[in-house]
């Protein structure tokens, strides 16, 4: 299989080490990082779109945020490498579009956040629903990119270990289907795959 080796680390984290979460979800982690930054003098701009990185003499001169230029001394980007490069002038980019088109990217994903008004007895916090051919699904991600014929997926029920994430007698969940990148996406397709997931979850 052409599945990236990184997934071995993910499996080891799940089954070898175990996974953890903040009591109130990962929003707690974000808030803690923001509070720490503010204590060190960091100023945050949220809901601001960065559309361009301007370069002069091989050095970043300024960035364009919400249509306005802002001077800066240093840029540290946590975004995807390809996306960050797309904000630079073409002559300042390390790789061209031909290079990126030749790369094998990690999968994208289709995510559903779902609430159940009943308890599901046969699921745990982490669930890998791999009830069909793994190799076929992998081929439909990497070799012949298309929407999976019979998707494998990951199901996460935080309410199994943290009752605060759902009302009494209910469950909180999200479902993740690994998919190829650059697929045509629309509501009809999403609805179709949601139905596929729900039909499988009815067995639990």
Predicted region positions:
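Generic, well-ordered alpha-helical scaffold segments in large soluble proteins
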Residues: 32, 36-40, 49, 78, ...
